[in-house]
Amino acid sequence: SGGSTYAKEWKSITIATEGGYEPWNLTLPGGKLSGFEPELMANLCQRMQIECKLVVQNWDGMIAGLNAGKYDVIMDAIVVTPERSKVVAFTQAYAATPASFIAVKGSLLPPSPTVKLHDDEKEIQAAIAPLRAALKGKTIGIASGTVYTPFIDKYFKDIADIREYNNSADAILDLQAERIDAVFDDITFANTTLSRPENNNLALSGPLMSGPIWGGGEAMGVRLTDPDLKAKLDSAIQAALADGTVKKLSEKWFKSDVTP
């Protein structure tokens, strides 16, 4: 084994989350943490028979705090990227958020079920053919610098006008002002947006697209020097995926299946 001469027992661990990123994690009146991730973590800790303590930490300093030893695990809808994998060790993914178009109800396509997309050109083309037909000559709004931006450019630029925004909330304002016809983002953003009374004229349009096409999914981070803790978490996540626990919590909090 690595640098340490003894294996750590891991009788208890401290997990940092933001506590303000609904429905992943949120803080209830009175200070208790709730949401998809805290409920999943409680289940995983039971499986591992480890005592768990959740602490609140801003996303900005989260990775630095982990590596400084302030806590042992970070859990905050963190998407696995090659860049981040250089500084933290990621567990197996417990979610892979699907994405969809949002449009004015009845303007494009009705919402349709989830399709899992891999890096397979034929599969992608088949899934998006109805969307391409519906969006021909229209304008699509997308936040710049997301995992979805290159996808929209690659598959829709030839038939639609693509407009980039600082964030998806600005794109929604333009959708309501009829300057654009659709906005593309993940289901977390979509559900939050659609739950607001002022957006009751909007709906999802076309399929929810999920799967490896969006990268590594959401996972927990641990220090690179704690492979034994990563292994414990991995087997607990695997078990929770296998017995339907993650799916059940996902449907409770996201109203859809976000399992990887």
Located regions from the model:
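Periplasmic-binding protein-like
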Residues: 19, 96-100, 187, 194-234, ...
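Acidic, polar ligand-binding/catalytic clefts
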Residues: 42, 46, 51-132, 202-213
